[in-house]
């Protein structure tokens, strides 16, 4: 599963769910458009276990409510 949010013409945030070595993960990472017109990941991002998602969403909902 994948979600993309364009930040500019050359940058976007990609949210992905994946499985690595038996662990269900969620990754949020900034991608940039290379000179070769290919979207590549940057070092800017975070990956966490899917079982931590409720905590992250709870905090984001608190921010949204402010």
Task: Give names to the regions the model predicted.
Residues 44-66:
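Mixed-charge, Lys/Arg-enriched low-complexity segments
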Residues 12-13, 24, 54, 61:
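Residue-level marker of intrinsically disordered, low-complexity segments enriched
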Residues 13-44:
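A short, structured beta-strand/loop element
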């Amino acid at each position: 599963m994948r979600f993309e949010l364009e930040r500019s013409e050359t940058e976007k945030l990609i949210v992905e769910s994946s499985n690595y070595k038996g662990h269900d993960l969620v990754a949020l990472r900034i991608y940039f458009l290379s000179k070769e017109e290919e979207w590549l990941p940057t070092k800017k991002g975070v990956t966490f276990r899917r079982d931590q998602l409720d905590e992250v969403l709870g905090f984001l909902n608190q921010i949204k409510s402010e």
